[in-house]
């Protein structure tokens, strides 16, 4: 298939005791390359393709030593870093940047002036779990970077329906505890900020748990000047569950969702779009593109 040099530093995620996004990207990438039998080297230039996963200052210095023709960079790029200007001003320094999803690509193009044809969407692969669901309660609430009053409204709603729930807050769980909680839930209620990929949410899908998502429409993390259309579920289709945006749509959306709760197939969605096989193929396409 091809052979890749991966560049990353564990210090990039070392501040975090629990699993986090940047660490998970590397972990899942290694697992997917192993599964698909793609040879790789770590932090040495041994093969033709260079994949620089983190473009912090260390990554920036590393970049200056690499063969650039077959170099792709991302998904960990912070657009507000001074050294990122180098990438914009010198598109010949890399084959492509990678973004985890379309809205992030749109952000780079519309707000930071990057050329559309120098950016490729590449989500990291999601494990396809062979779990037997063991349902012991109704709803797992996944709550991250949203307002307390929104969480309270959802809890009140679930109480009014006599549905039991447990809550998982971002950063507050180990991986095994998280998987057990997910596997025991009948469904998941997602109250989430914007996600560039949403790996934890996709793991919930991959375990076959349907989701009702209270989505949002914009990225406002850096204020008005950088406002762009965005979402908490960048990878989604009707097999995954139901979506609403305003609290007054909750009752109607939930009624529909709950009536067809056994007809969703989130696991099938992951297998078709985000499996290790599919995402490694996508990565090799980016490297091999003309």
Where do the protein language model's features map onto the residues?
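N-terminal pre-catalytic "stem/leader" segment of glycosyltransferase-like enzymes
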Residues: 1-62, 277, 281-290
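Conserved catalytic-core segment of nucleotide-activated headgroup transferases in glycan assembly
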Residues: 17-18, 124-178
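Active-site proximal beta-strand in glycosyltransferases
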Residues: 50-81, 98
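A conserved, positively charged/aromatic
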Residues: 86-95
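Donor nucleotide-sugar binding/catalytic pocket of nucleotide-sugar-dependent glycosyltransferases
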Residues: 96-106, 114-129
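A short hydrophobic beta-strand element within the catalytic core of glycosyltransferases
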Residues: 188-189
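Aromatic "clamp/platform" in nucleotide-sugar-dependent glycosyltransferases that forms part
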Residues: 193
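Catalytic binding pocket for nucleotide-activated donors in carbohydrate/polymer assembly enzymes
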Residues: 196-273
């Amino acid at each position: 298939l091809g052979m890749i040099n991966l560049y990353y530093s564990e210090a990039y995620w070392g501040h975090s005791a629990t699993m986090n996004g940047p660490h998970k990207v590397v972990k899942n990438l290694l697992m997917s390359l192993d599964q698909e039998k793609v040879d790789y080297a770590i932090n040495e230039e041994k093969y033709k393709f260079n994949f620089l996963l983190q473009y912090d200052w260390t990554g920036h210095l590393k970049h200056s030593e690499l063969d650039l023709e077959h170099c792709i960079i991302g998904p960990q790029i912070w657009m507000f870093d001074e050294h990122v200007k180098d990438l914009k001003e010198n598109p010949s320094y890399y084959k492509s940047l990678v973004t985890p999803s379309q809205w992030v690509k749109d952000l780079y193009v519309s707000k930071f002036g990057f050329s559309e044809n120098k950016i490729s969407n590449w989500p990291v692969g999601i494990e396809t779990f062979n779990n037997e669901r063991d349902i012991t309660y109704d709803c797992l609430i996944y709550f991250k970077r949203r307002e307390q009053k929104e969480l309270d409204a959802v809890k009140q709603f679930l109480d009014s329906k006599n549905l039991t729930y447990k809550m998982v807050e971002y950063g507050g769980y180990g991986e095994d505890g998280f998987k057990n909680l997910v596997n025991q839930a009948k469904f998941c209620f997602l109250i989430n900020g914007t996600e560039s990929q949403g790996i934890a949410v996709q793991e919930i899908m991959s375990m076959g748990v349907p989701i009702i998502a209270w989505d949002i429409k914009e990225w406002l993390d850096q204020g008005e000047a950088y406002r762009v259309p965005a979402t908490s579920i960048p990878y989604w289709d009707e097999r995954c569950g139901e979506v609403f945006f305003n609290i007054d749509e909750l009752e109607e959306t939930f009624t529909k969702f709950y009536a067809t709760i056994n007809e969703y197939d989130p696991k099938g969605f992951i297998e078709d779009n985000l499996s290790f096989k599919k995402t490694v193929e996508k990565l090799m396409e980016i490297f091999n593109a003309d």
